[in-house]
């Protein structure tokens, strides 16, 4: 049976993550209070951040930026989008 958490992002009790996503305090907070569903939303947001900011995994600043964005996404009022971000056209 999945471990349940009261998801801070989605506001309801849902299955939690199987492990801490990061080996730091933020990773523990996410593990304790973020659901698998919210984590899937983060992964999509994460890809957008990497692309829009043109971040390189080899750059040490990338990790710092991603941790800041994850903190804001999960625990802030609203995640900030990159200044020049344009959402993809809707499929329809």
From Swiss-Prot:
NCBIfam families the record matches: PRK05408.1
Keywords: Iron
A GO term, aspect molecular function: iron ion binding
HAMAP family noted in UniProt: Fe_traffic_YggX
Protein family according to the UniProt entry: Belongs to the Fe(2+)-trafficking protein family.
Name of the protein in question: Probable Fe(2+)-trafficking protein
Cellular component terms per the entry's GO annotation: cytosol
One biological process term in Gene Ontology: cellular response to oxidative stress
Species annotation: Anaeromyxobacter dehalogenans (strain 2CP-C)
SUPFAM superfamilies cross-referenced by the UniProt entry: YggX-like
Biological role stated in the UniProt entry: Could be a mediator in iron transactions between iron acquisition and iron-requiring processes, such as synthesis and/or repair of Fe-S clusters in biosynthetic enzymes.
Domain of life of the native organism: Bacteria
Disulfide cross-links: none
Pfam families per record: Iron_traffic (PF04362)
Keyword Electron transport: no
């Amino acid at each position: 049976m999945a471990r349940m958490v009261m998801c801070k992002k989605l506001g309801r009790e849902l299955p939690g993550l199987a492990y801490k996503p990061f080996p730091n305090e933020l990773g523990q907070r996410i593990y304790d209070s973020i659901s698998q569903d919210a984590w899937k939303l983060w992964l999509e947001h994460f890809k957008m951040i990497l692309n829009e900011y043109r971040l390189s995994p080899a750059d040490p600043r990338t990790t710092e930026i991603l941790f800041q964005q994850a903190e804001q996404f999960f625990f802030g009022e609203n995640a900030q989008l990159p200044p020049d971000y344009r959402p993809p056209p809707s499929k329809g």
